[in-house]
Amino acid sequence: MIEDNKENKDHSLERGRASLIFSLKNEVGGLIKALKIFQEKHVNLLHIESRKSKRRNSEFEIFVDCDINREQLNDIFHLLKSHTNVLSVNLPDNFTLKEDGMETVPWFPKKISDLDHCANRVLMYGSELDADHPGFKDNVYRKRRKYFADLAMNYKHGDPIPKVEFTEEEIKTWGTVFQELNKLYPTHACREYLKNLPLLSKYCGYREDNIPQLEDVSNFLKERTGFSIRPVAGYLSPRDFLSGLAFRVFHCTQYVRHSSDPFYTPEPDTCHELLGHVPLLAEPSFAQFSQEIGLASLGASEEAVQKLATCYFFTVEFGLCKQDGQLRVFGAGLLSSISELKHALSGHAKVKPFDPKITCKQECLITTFQDVYFVSESFEDAKEKMREFTKTIKRPFGVKYNPYTRSIQILKDTKSITSAMNELQHDLDVVSDALAKVSRKPSI
């Protein structure tokens, strides 16, 4: 045993030359914090370069070449993952990164508080708007956007979501969207949506003259399906967004689209989140469908995550379903867009049956109508098809969500799988006992 430990220690101290590329926001002190991680782990840096990110104008990419041992590299890799976006790691031939005894997999949150490490990796921050954004030249709007972004960036798991006093202009914009969409919902939205929307009006203040507070909405969802809301400053990467769903956490923007064009937004805003997503997150079957996509993404390859994100896009965002022999909408992108909601059920839109193997290859369009929409027989049908599809995703482990600790159980060996089976057996015993009692009950 001692010899084994010595061998493992020697193995972990093998040295080599490795290079890493990670991205940082262009802010004072960002690089110093990242390099301090190398210093604290006593890693010798051989070369450092910086360049402006080709993907995001507000970020810089840092290239680091270093002399490092296996143990140091594992530590630094996971510390950097918590503070930066690690783009690539070039390892010596004799190195492999390991985590909990597994071959290298992309970092993913193991407990709900770990979302603090990835919820702020937004693609745009605050007042950083593209030139074609309706609010690009509006300094007052940009300042307001930064206010909402700062609220989200300062949020930590367990905090109450700050209450916001919305401006008259924001409420008017919300009201315009709310009024027009509610004219279409009875003939376009699925029955589950129509069932939950009145409950949100009753318990969360969904009204034309009132923008609901995220804290109230989050508390409502917790009681209905166990989902909660977490404020976010803007777009997240597919991996970071889907990882939240694994914990039944929905990352939700709080800002309102620009008033100059209330029927268009190039990005998700609170109208999209609250009117498009929330009513169906209050539906148990749909909530389960969303969480299972999130769980499938944990530790998956970039290619697999992209496929899952595309399936999410064409179901949760732009999905159609059949009800009473007619097409109905359950996708949030459609339920929050007056023009595309009309178009999707106009009879002129191209519609195909939902098949994840085909859907995952379809191009996602952001600023125009989709070229095609996918229709599911039901949420259960979509869920079963996604379950079969996720079996094709290669991971050296399985995952199971523990709702009591709000953490992820990694099923990677006999011990962890046996533990999960014992929990399942207990649940089956409870159900079997209940069935036995019901069957013995005399009929009236």
From Swiss-Prot:
User: Out of the domains of life, which is the source?
Assistant: Eukaryota
Residues that coordinate or bind L-tryptophan: Y235, R257, T265, S336, I366
- Which GO terms fall under biological process for this protein? aromatic amino acid metabolic process; bone remodeling; mammary gland alveolus development; platelet degranulation; positive regulation of fat cell differentiation; regulation of hemostasis; serotonin biosynthetic process
- Protein's name according to its UniProt entry: Tryptophan 5-hydroxylase 1
Q: Which organism is it from?
A: Homo sapiens (Human)
Q: Which reaction does it catalyse?
A: (6R)-L-erythro-5,6,7,8-tetrahydrobiopterin + L-tryptophan + O2 = 5-hydroxy-L-tryptophan + (4aS,6R)-4a-hydroxy-L-erythro-5,6,7,8-tetrahydrobiopterin
Q: What keywords sit in the KW lines?
A: Iron, Metal-binding, Monooxygenase, Oxidoreductase, Phosphoprotein, Serotonin biosynthesis, Ubl conjugation
Q: Name one GO cellular component term.
A: cytosol
The PTM Phosphoserine maps to: S58
| Entry similarity comment | Belongs to the biopterin-dependent aromatic amino acid hydroxylase family.
SUPFAM superfamilies reported for this sequence: ACT-like (SSF55021), Aromatic aminoacid monoxygenases, catalytic and oligomerization domains (SSF56534)
- Domain ACT positions: 19-94
Which cofactor does the UniProt annotation name? Fe(2+)
Its post-translational modification remark reads: Ubiquitinated, leading to its degradation by the proteasome. Ubiquitinated is triggered by phosphorylation.
Enzyme Commission (EC) number:
1.14.16.4
Task: Relate the assembly described in the record.
Answer: Homotetramer. Interacts with DNAJC12.
